[in-house]
């Protein structure tokens, strides 16, 4: 389906929530290190409940490693940022697209964000003078909009519990 990328996430329950979202939508979750917590953190595990076994989660030692190992189509990668120039709702998404989110306290590093063409720097609408949405909420809104655009197409295969 879609690829969710969290670059240097800091808050365990947010990542747990995104793991649960990935399991329920058929998305693959990519975690770009360093992480601000242990993958065994009880708060992260609690937020993800028993969905960890249903989600496909890959860890990457850095952004360059993700690009090298996964070889994504760069034209289908979207940076979600409050500095975005285009709304998620004005963008057409395709199965296999990549949604890249930054750390909770600082977003995407500017040097990474600037590698995305302006049309691939997306934002979620908010009221003026508001800083940002919670990371897991922003991921959920984006994934569900992309999935809606694709008629809630079910992925061909679902990861099975071990």
UniProtKB/Swiss-Prot annotation:
Reaction equation(s) it catalyzes: cytidine(34) in tRNA + S-adenosyl-L-methionine = 2'-O-methylcytidine(34) in tRNA + S-adenosyl-L-homocysteine + H(+); 5-carboxymethylaminomethyluridine(34) in tRNA(Leu) + S-adenosyl-L-methionine = 5-carboxymethylaminomethyl-2'-O-methyluridine(34) in tRNA(Leu) + S-adenosyl-L-homocysteine + H(+)
InterPro entries cross-referenced by the UniProt entry: Alpha/beta_knot_MTases, SpoU_MeTrfase, TrmL, tRNA_m1G_MTases_N
Coiled-coil regions, chain positions: none
Keyword Lyase part of the UniProt annotation: no
GO biological process: wobble position cytosine ribose methylation; wobble position uridine ribose methylation
Any GO molecular function: RNA binding
GO annotation, cellular component aspect: cytoplasm
SUPFAM superfamilies: alpha/beta knot
Pfam family, one: SpoU_methylase
Residues annotated to bind S-adenosyl-L-methionine: 80, 102, 124, 132
Primary site of residence: cytoplasm
Localization per record: Cytoplasm
This enzyme's EC code(s): 2.1.1.207
Keywords: Cytoplasm, Methyltransferase, S-adenosyl-L-methionine, Transferase, tRNA processing
Subunit (UniProt): Homodimer.
Entry similarity comment: Belongs to the class IV-like SAM-binding methyltransferase superfamily. RNA methyltransferase TrmH family. TrmL subfamily.
Function: Methylates the ribose at the nucleotide 34 wobble position in the two leucyl isoacceptors tRNA(Leu)(CmAA) and tRNA(Leu)(cmnm5UmAA). Catalyzes the methyl transfer from S-adenosyl-L-methionine to the 2'-OH of the wobble nucleotide.
Protein name, entry field: tRNA (cytidine(34)-2'-O)-methyltransferase
């Amino acid at each position: 389906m879609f690829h969710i990328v969290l670059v240097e996430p800091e808050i365990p329950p947010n990542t747990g929530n995104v793991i649960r979202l990935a399991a329920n939508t058929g998305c693959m979750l990519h975690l770009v290190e360093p992480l601000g917590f242990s993958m065994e953190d009880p708060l992260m595990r609690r937020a993800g409940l028993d969905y960890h076994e249903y989600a496909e989660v890959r860890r990457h030692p850095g952004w360059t490693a993700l690009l090298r190992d996964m070889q994504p189509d760069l034209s289908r990668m979207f940076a979600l940022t409050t500095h975005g120039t285009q709304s998620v709702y004005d963008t057409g998404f395709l199965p296999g697209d990549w949604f890249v989110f930054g750390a909770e306290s600082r977003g995407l590093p500017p040097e990474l964000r600037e590698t995305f063409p302006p049309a691939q720097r997306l934002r979620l609408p908010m009221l003026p003078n508001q800083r940002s949405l919670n990371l897991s909420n922003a991921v959920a809104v984006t994934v569900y909009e992309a999935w809606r655009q694709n008629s809630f197409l079910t992925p061909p295969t679902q990861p099975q519990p071990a």
